[in-house]
Every structure is written in C-alpha cells, then in structure tokens.
Design a protein with these regions (language model features):
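Short, charged/polar N-terminal "headpieces" of proteins
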Residues: 1-57
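Detector for methionine-enriched segments
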Residues: 1, 23-26, 72-75, 90, ...
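A short, structured beta-strand/loop element
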Residues: 36-98
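Generic detector of leucine side chains in alpha-helical contexts
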Residues: 23, 29, 36, 84, ...
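Short, compact, well-ordered microdomains
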Residues: 89-131
C-alpha cells in the first residue's frame, strides 16, 4: 500500500516536500506481553502477501519499554528464523536474538495465520509466551 506523506521542516523553514512511501501497518507486541527482552512487530493484516516478500516480524533494535519503530530488524518466520538484512547495526545481544528466534519457532503457525483466519486478539490469547 502506498501513501503520500507530506514533510515540513519548521526549524529551517524549508519548503514542504511530498513523497510516496510504502507503509505496512504492524501490530506492536510489547515485551511484557511476550516475555521477550524486546518489543516486536507483527503483520496482522496480511499486507506481506501484496508486498512481494515472505511473512516476517520486525524486532525493535533496543530493549526500551516504549515502542520505537525506527531502525527495526526484520526476521523471517519459520523453523530456522534468520535476520533478513546483512550486517545490521545491532544494539541487541545474541541472547536477545535467540529469545526472539525461540518465540518465532514456538508461534510460527500462529504468526502465519495472522491476517488470514486469526486476528491479533486471538493471536495474543493463543501465543506461547517466552519466559
């Protein structure tokens, strides 16, 4: 899905710029709900099917409590989850990444059903929490 976004830098009083950007709405699953050391983002609308790539989650690249959607790390969903970008600037430990992989493996079928026959509320009720 493509949206037009208008950007205006008020500090420098620059002209307004309009550009198109691909935006995919993803639901934030906070770490207190999942048991993970980081917040993660899941596609609960099935937009990934229209985008030309496989389903994935995005990992917040810090351990903060507050959701941060900049500098996210995409990870595949499957039996052997993998980071989908080369050499990311990583602020997370290998232990953090391993916990996310464990969550994906435990919930891969549910993650793939999101946006098809399962909504985010049903997912949250059924998901395996990592402790």
């Amino acid at each position: 899905m493509s949206y037009k976004i208008t950007v205006h830098n008020r500090e420098q009083n620059e002209k307004t710029h309009t550009y198109e950007a691909d935006m995919c709405e993803m639901a934030c699953l906070r770490k207190k709900r999942t048991g993970l050391p980081v917040n993660i983002y899941v596609d609960d609308s099935g937009v990934w099917k229209q985008s030309g790539h496989a389903n994935r989650i995005k990992i917040q690249n810090n351990r903060g409590e507050h959701p941060v959607t900049t500098d996210m790390i995409p990870m595949s969903i499957g039996e052997a989850p993998d980071i989908l970008i080369k050499n990311p600037k990583m602020e997370l430990s290998q232990s953090d990444i391993n916990a996310v992989k464990k969550f994906i493996i435990a919930n891969k079928d549910l993650l793939n059903r999101l946006g098809e026959d399962m909504d985010i509320d049903d997912f949250i009720k059924a998901m395996v929490v990592i402790r």
